[in-house]
Amino acid sequence: LREPDLWWQLRSGQWMVENFAVTRSDLFSFTQEGVEWINVKWFFEVLQYFFASLGGPELLLLMQTFANILLLWMLYKLAQTVYSLQLVKKFQVGIAFIISVLSFLFAMDYRMAGRPEMVSHVLSLAFLLLLLNHRREKSKGIFWLIPLQLFWANSHEAYGTGLVILVVAIAAHLFESRIRKWEPLDKNFMLSSLLAIASTGINPRGLYLFIHPFNIFNQVGDNKFTTELYNIQTNYFWQQTEAWLAIGVLFICLIGFFLFRKKLGSPGILKQFGLAYFVLFVLFIYLGSTAHRNLTFFFIWAFPLLLLTIESIGQWKLKNIKLFG
């Protein structure tokens, strides 16, 4: 436990359990007591208090452990999904997968601290998995977007990320189905995505949460004291290992993009991954540049392309070794 505000989250969770109400004003600070507080992460703070009450605040790390296990399971399922794109061989747990997962964990470690943001990490990956898997199977599993977005909107301020993913995915699908005619309109996808967006309004603050992400973004930009919020224009940002890891991951992903583009052509690679994936890839690069802590979202979204690129490069090297060895 290394975060200075965990006590605040635990105390807020305790107050809400004892009073059977959601905090609506600042209760515990010296300078802002009584000021209105939009506590998006109220539900997660209740969960934090529940875990801490079982055996002390150290059990918050157990929550992070559960989140990490979920991440690993979803990375495995995501690997199975992206290998089905047939850009590389059939999936198996090999060197490429192990390297990609270890790189992912190393890159994410700095934000795996038992904080509510673990929800956003898990759900960002879950959204990615659901969207890519739906391109392959067209199953009704896509309706999981609805309860997941509902949970997100009551557990962490980055729920706006889910809204952006959904809006971009809807716009991209309309472009692919109505303009380019690559596929028919997917009614299940459209319905589940629209209902997931609507579910954001089910929270103690109601419809206000649809505009709250803009306020959060402005508040983050005004914060000059929290180093994790320093952006790409600061020296601090470039002094962090994760910034250079992001550059490396981006470089590898670009290699992969051009390799697969050469193999399939531009329309082909867009059809395989989906236009939404690449639009969001660019948006998450931008998001990562706005704050050091936001690089995690880029690492999550880059994982499929990183994995396939490493696998493809490995196959190419193996082929050349056999030819000249």
Regions found by a protein language model. Give the residues of each.
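Short acidic/glycine- and proline-prone juxtamembrane loop motifs at membrane-interface regions
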Residues: 110-119
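Hydrophobic/aromatic-rich transmembrane helices and adjacent perimembrane loops
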Residues: 9, 165, 287-314
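Short hydrophobic/aromatic helix or loop-helix immediately within or flanking a transmembrane segment
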Residues: 31-58, 62, 66
